[in-house]
Amino acid sequence: QCEDGWICPCCEADRVTYDTWAVQLLTKVLTGYYECSSDERIPEVLYRVLKNYYELLVSGKIALFNWGKFRWFEGLVAVNFVYKRYGEQWLQDLAKILKEQGADYDEFIKDWKRPVNYWQWGTHIVNIGMMLKTEAVTCDLLGKEYTDHAQDLYDVLSGYNGTPVELFTGDECLSGLSPIQGTELCAVVEQMYSYELLY
């Protein structure tokens, strides 16, 4: 970890073009590691990483794009953890920035109703598995009431891309209802993790 809190494997000059999904992923994994290990170094590491992330985003030195934009909610796993521990306002502000810069999956619902047969962020099956937990990880931080929106999204996804085992079809992107379509393993894992946070 750098002195300023940065934790990703790139030099300072490259940060502006670095996809910060890595920040979101690393902090999510470290949160899970802490839950298993109770390693007291982790909360301080997470605090410093997220404070640095916040400062870079709020200053405009970096912005979400690519994976970071389409997986912004992943970062909120750690933001929730640190907020519960420290309760500082900048963590709620970070959540707002991530939501504002992140993709709104409601805009892609129309694309879930038929296989688009080409790769796109909004129908990427792993992104969708991750996305289901969005409301669960944002409500407390953003002061919003929980509406069970994940169920609405699930109903659309299941209706047009569902399987008998409650997963969605997709090798990279949603594949429709054909019984010959499978499901990418990463999507299974991410869907399970979303359900863990939802229920």
Label every model-predicted segment.
Residues Q1-Y199:
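Glycan-recognition and catalytic cores of secretory/periplasmic carbohydrate-active enzymes
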